[in-house]
C-alpha cells in the first residue's frame, strides 16, 4: 500500500485533503545532488544505468518532498530503440541520424522487442519502486507520436518543423505510416512500464503547439488516443496524463482521448480550463516555470493565485499542482521547496 497516494487519487478525481504536487524535470540539473552524479557520466548513460536512474528519480522525493516520482529517462529512447542514432548533448542540443525522410527510411526503422531494447527503463522502474518503498507513486512516461515523429524527421530539434510538415502536406500517407509505426512502439513501451511497476503514466507531446487545430486532430490526437485506449483496456486502474503543450483551444478534444488527466501550459487561466472541461478530467498544472526565479513571497503569491483560480473542489474535480513545463536548470532548489511546502499548506482550504 502506498503511504502517500494523493497524486493517484487526484488523477482519478477522488476526494483528497490537499492538492498534490510534483514538477516536470524534477530530477534534473537544478539539484546539486543530480549534478554531482552527472559529472561522472553522460546523460544517456545515466538513463541506461538503472542504479543511477533510480537514485536521481528519488532525489526530489527526499530533498523537495514532492508527492510523486517520475522515472528518470528521456523521450528519445524510443527513437533509439527503433534504430536511430541519438546524441543528446545537454548544452548543444539533440542529433538523430539518419533523419527519416523517405519510405526506405521508414521501412528501415524496427519495431523493437521492448524488453531487449528498453529493458534498462524497466529495470530502473523496478529498482526505483523497491527503493521508494511505497512512499509515493512512480510515474512512467513516453513522448507522443507527433513529438517523436518531428525529432525523427527533422533529425533533432527544430524552429519551424519544415521537414516534418513537408512530409505531412506532401506525403500524408507516408507521415501516417511513420506515426503509426512510432505509436505502436510507444503503446507497447507504456504497457511494459506498467508491468514493471509504474503507478501512473504521462504522454508528453512537447511540440503539440506546432500544429494547427485541424492538423493536431489528424496527425497527433488519434495516436495519443490509440495509446490511452490500449492502456485503459489492459490496465483500467492506471491513470494516464496527456500533456499536449499549449493546445489550449482543443482541451475537450484531448479529454476525448479517454485520459484521466490533462497537463496545462502556463499561458492559460486554469479557471477557464476547468470551466470548459466541466471536471471531466483532472487538470495538472500550471505555473510558469520562470516564477521560480522570483522571491519566496512572489512564488507563494503565484501559487495561491492558481489554487484560487482552480477554486473549490467538488466530488468530481481533480487538480495536481505542477509547472506548465519543465523546471529550468538554474532554479534555486530552495525556491522549489518553498513552492511545494506552500501548496501543501495552502491547498487544504479548497478541499
Curated annotation (Swiss-Prot):
Catalysed transformations (reactions): uroporphyrinogen III + 4 H(+) = coproporphyrinogen III + 4 CO2
GO biological processes: protoporphyrinogen IX biosynthetic process
Residues annotated as binding substrate: 25-29, 74, 151, 206, 325
InterPro entries xrefs: UROD/MetE-like_sf, Uroporphyrinogen_deCO2ase_HemE, Uroporphyrinogen_deCOase
UniProt-annotated location(s): Cytoplasm
Gene Ontology annotations for the cellular component aspect, listed alphabetically: cytosol
Record organism: Prosthecochloris aestuarii (strain DSM 271 / SK 413)
Site entry: Transition state stabilizer: 74
Main localization category: cytoplasm
Record-stated family: Belongs to the uroporphyrinogen decarboxylase family.
Protein name: Uroporphyrinogen decarboxylase
Amino acid at each position: 500500500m502506498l503511504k502517500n497516494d494523493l497524486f493517484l487519487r487526484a488523477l482519478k478525481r477522488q476526494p483528497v485533503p490537499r492538492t498534490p504536487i510534483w514538477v516536470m524535470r524534477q530530477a534534473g540539473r537544478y539539484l546539486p545532488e543530480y549534478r554531482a552524479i552527472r559529472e561522472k557520466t553522460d546523460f544517456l548513460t545515466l538513463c541506461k544505468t538503472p542504479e543511477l536512474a533510480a537514485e536521481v528519480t528519488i532525489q526530489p522525493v527526499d530533498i523537495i518532498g514532492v508527492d510523486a516520482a517520475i522515472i528518470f529517462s528521456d523521450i528519445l529512447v524510443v527513437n533509439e530503440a527503433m534504430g536511430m542514432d541519438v546524441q543528446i548533448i545537454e548544452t548543444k542540443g539533440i542529433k538523430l541520424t539518419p533523419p527519416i525522410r523517405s519510405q526506405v527510411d521508414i521501412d528501415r526503422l524496427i519495431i523493437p522487442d521492448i524488453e531487449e531494447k528498453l529493458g534498462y527503463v524497466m529495470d530502473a522502474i523496478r529498482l526505483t519502486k523497491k527503493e521508494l518503498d511505497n512512499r509515493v507513486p512512480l510515474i512512467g512516461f513516453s513522448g507522443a507520436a507527433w513529438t517523436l515523429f518531428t525529432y525523427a524527421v527533422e533529425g533533432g530539434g527544430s524552429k519551424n518543423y519544415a521537414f516534418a510538415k513537408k512530409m505531412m502536406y506532401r506525403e500524408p500517407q507516408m507521415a501516417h505510416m511513420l506515426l503509426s509505426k512510432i505509436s505502436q512502439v510507444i503503446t507497447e513501451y507504456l504497457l511494459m512500464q506498467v508491468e514493471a511497476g509504474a503507478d501512473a503514466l504521462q504522454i508528453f507531446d512537447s511540440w503539440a503547439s506546432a500544429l494547427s487545430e485541424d492538423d493536431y486532430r489528424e496527425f497527433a490526437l488519434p495516436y495519443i488516443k490509440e495509446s490511452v485506449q490500449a492502456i485503459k483496456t489492459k490496465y483500467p486502474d492506471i491513470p494516464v496524463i496527456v500533456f499536449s503543450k499549449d493546445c489550449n483551444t482543443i482541451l475537450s478534444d484531448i479529454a476525448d482521448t479517454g485520459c484521466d488527466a490533462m497537463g496545462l501550459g502556463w499561458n492559460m487561466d486554469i479557471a477557464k480550463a476547468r470551466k470548459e472541461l466541466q471536471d471531466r478530467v483532472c487538470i495538472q498544472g500550471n505555473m510558469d516555470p520562470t516564477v521560480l526565479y522570483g522571491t519566496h513571497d512572489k512564488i507563494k503569491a503565484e501559487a495561491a493565485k492558481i489554487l484560487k483560480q482552480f477554486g473549490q473542489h467538488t466530488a468530481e474535480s481533480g487538480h495536481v499542482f505542477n509547472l506548465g513545463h519543465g523546471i529550468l536548470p538554474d532554479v534555486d532548489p530552495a525556491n522549489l521547496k518553498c513552492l511545494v511546502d506552500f501548496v501543501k499548506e495552502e491547498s487544504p482550504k479548497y478541499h
